[in-house]
Amino acid sequence: MRIEYLADRPEALPPLARWKHKEWGHFRPGDTVEKRQARLADTSNRDRIPLTVVALEGEEVLGSASLIEHDMETRMELTPWLAGVYVGEAFRRRGIGAELVRRIMSEAGKLKVPLLYLYTVHSERFYAALGWTFLERTSYLEQDVVIMTDKP
C-alpha cells in the first residue's frame, strides 16, 4: 500500500466521489456525485491547503483523507481540519485509515500547521488511539459530534 497526492492520481476522483457521496451525501441535500467530485478536485494540491491524499494498492483506490481550511460552518474560527477520512468497505481493518491520518498529520507539519481539528460522529475511539484529544461534544447537521484536536 502506498499513499500519493490526489493531484498525482486524478483517476481516483470518480471512485472517491462515489464512496464519499454514499457515506456523507445525506449531509448536503441536493448534492450529487458530480458536485462532490468537483469539490474533491479542488483539493488536488501538493503544497498548500486544501490537499487530499489517496491510498492505493497497485492501481486500486483504497481510500483517502483531506486537509482543508474549514469543515464546520458553525465553527469557522477553528482551522484547518482533517476531513473526509474514508476507506472502502472491502479494505477496512488493515490500518489504512490510520496511515491516511498519519500522512495528513505529516502534511500539516510540513505546512507549519500548529493545531489540527476534526469532527466525528462514530470514530472518537479510533482517533483517540492515534493521539487525538477531545475538545468538545456538540450538535452539527442534526447529529451529535465530537470535535478533536492534535498537533502535527
Tell me what each language-model feature is.
Residues 108-120:
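Conserved GNAT acetyl-CoA-binding A-motif
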Residues 91, 95-103:
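Conserved acetyl-CoA pyrophosphate-binding loop and the N-cap/start of the following alpha-helix
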Residues 52-54, 60-70, 81, 86:
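Conserved beta-strand in the GNAT
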Residues 16-24:
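Hydrophobic alpha-helical core bundles mediating ligand binding, dimerization, or RNAP-core interactions
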Residues 68-79, 94:
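Helix-adjacent hinge/juxtasegments
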Residues 118-123, 133-152:
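C-terminal "cap" of GNAT-fold acetyltransferases
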Residues 2-16:
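A short beta-loop-alpha structural element at the N-terminal edge
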Residues 25-54, 62:
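Active-site rim helix/loop that mediates acceptor-substrate recognition in acyltransferases
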